């Protein structure tokens, strides 16, 4: 259960670890998308809320130089995949849109490597979570 009883974002959130805390970012339930961000502190075994992000599920996330980056995802309520990139800087109280991927996609994975963040795979099609349509797309994001 996330956020002390609100477990609606447990389906398809992006996830990242920063400063010893686990971030569950966005998510969805049925055709509803959420922008909720929950932060888990394992040392205290407690959840807190973090700054909300524009609603999305199935996004990729990575940590680079102390910031969390979120890539794309899907808006089921709008039946579209997303290309935007958001950053949560250290100590920030809001997410900032910092760009867009060349190709909108969901279910892509983001990995920091050699000073860049690589976005791998994913689907270009909304509502394709149970289909077999993936991709071999690889993009690099230079923060």
For the regions a language model picked out, list residue spans one by one.
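Kelch-like beta-propeller repeat domains
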Residues: 1-143
């Amino acid at each position: 259960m996330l956020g002390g009883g609100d477990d609606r974002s447990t389906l398809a959130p992006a996830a990242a670890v920063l400063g010893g805390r686990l971030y569950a970012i966005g998510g969805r339930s049925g055709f509803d998308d959420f922008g909720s961000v929950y932060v888990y502190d394992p040392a205290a075994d407690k959840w807190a809320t973090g700054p909300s992000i524009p609603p999305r599920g199935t996004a990729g996330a990575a940590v680079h130089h102390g910031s969390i980056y979120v890539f794309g995802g899907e808006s089921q309520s709008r039946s579209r995949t997303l290309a935007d990139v958001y950053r949560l800087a250290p100590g920030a109280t809001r997410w900032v849109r910092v760009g867009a991927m060349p190709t909108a996609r969901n279910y892509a994975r983001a990995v920091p490597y050699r000073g860049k963040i690589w976005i791998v795979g994913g689907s270009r099609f909304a509502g394709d979570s149970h289909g077999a349509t993936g991709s071999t797309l690889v993009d690099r994001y230079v923060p």
